[in-house]
């Protein structure tokens, strides 16, 4: 099991114009408060504005013989150094000016998911997390992301 760290690094910033598809790494994006990532199909006034996935989990998946790129599982932010799936709901993450709050761990993969059809399986249902944007700003590859510990 991966060691839990309080901080990590953004490895990719990905968006897609439609839901249920792979995302494309755009390297930098504007996150809007209570909306999500500008230009992403999942943005909106709901609890799954931004999806996050641990980079290490994608690397483990690739070691099994897959060859997936950033955004292949529909994740918005690919994070190195934090085991996203182990973060409890309500955890806050800071990346520069951006403040996110974890709202959901995992998801149900809908039948006929384009990602599952292409890749063969999807790790988002058990490794991905979702968050809402409490404070907006710009996020880019290489930015530090850290868990905000409550006093």
Short names for language-model regions:
Residues 1-151:
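Metal-cofactor-dependent catalytic cores
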């Amino acid at each position: 099991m991966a060691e839990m760290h309080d901080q990590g690094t953004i490895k990719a910033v990905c968006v897609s114009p439609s839901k249920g598809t792979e995302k494309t790494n755009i390297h930098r994006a504007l996150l809007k408060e209570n909306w999500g990532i500008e230009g992403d199909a999942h943005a909106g006034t709901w609890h799954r504005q931004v999806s996050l996935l641990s980079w290490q989990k994608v690397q483990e998946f690739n070691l099994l013989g897959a060859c997936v790129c950033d955004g292949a599982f529909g994740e918005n932010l690919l994070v190195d150094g934090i085991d996203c799936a182990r973060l409890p709901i309500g955890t806050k993450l800071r990346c520069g000016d951006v403040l996110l709050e974890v709202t959901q761990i995992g998801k149900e993969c809908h039948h006929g998911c384009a990602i599952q059809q292409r890749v063969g399986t999807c790790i988002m249902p058990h490794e991905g997390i979702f968050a809402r944007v409490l404070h907006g700003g710009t996020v880019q590859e290489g930015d530090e992301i850290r868990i905000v510990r409550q006093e």
